[in-house]
Amino acid sequence: MWPVLWTVVRTYAPYVTFPVAFVVGAVGYHLEWFIRGKEPQPVEEEKSISERREDRKLDELLGKDHTQVVSLKDKLEFAPKAVLNRNRPEKN
C-alpha cells in the first residue's frame, strides 16, 4: 500500500503540493494576526532636514516686514570703490 501511495504522491506532486502549501500559509497568516492582536497606531513621520529648513525659513519670513527695504543707494555703497576700480586704469 505504501509504495502505491508514494508513487501517486510523486506523480501528482505539483497538484498535491500547492493545496497543502496554500492551507499551511492561510493557517499561518491567520494565526499570526491572532497572536499579534490589534494593529499599532501609525507613527508620525519625522520631517526631513530640508523640510525643517524650509519651515524655519518660512517662519523667519513671516516675522519680517516686507515693506521696509534697503534703498538701492545703500546697497551700491556697500562695496568699497577701491574694489570696484581695482582692474581699471586710473583716469587722470
Curated annotation (Swiss-Prot):
Location within or outside the cell: Membrane
Gene Ontology CC terms, in alphabetical order: membrane
Annotated family: Belongs to the SMIM12 family.
Ranges that cross the membrane: 12-34
Membrane topology annotation: Single-pass membrane protein
UniProt xrefs under InterPro entries: UPF0767
Domain of life: Eukaryota
Pfam family, one: UPF0767
This protein's name: Small integral membrane protein 12
Entry keyword set: Membrane, Transmembrane, Transmembrane helix
Location (main, coarse): membrane
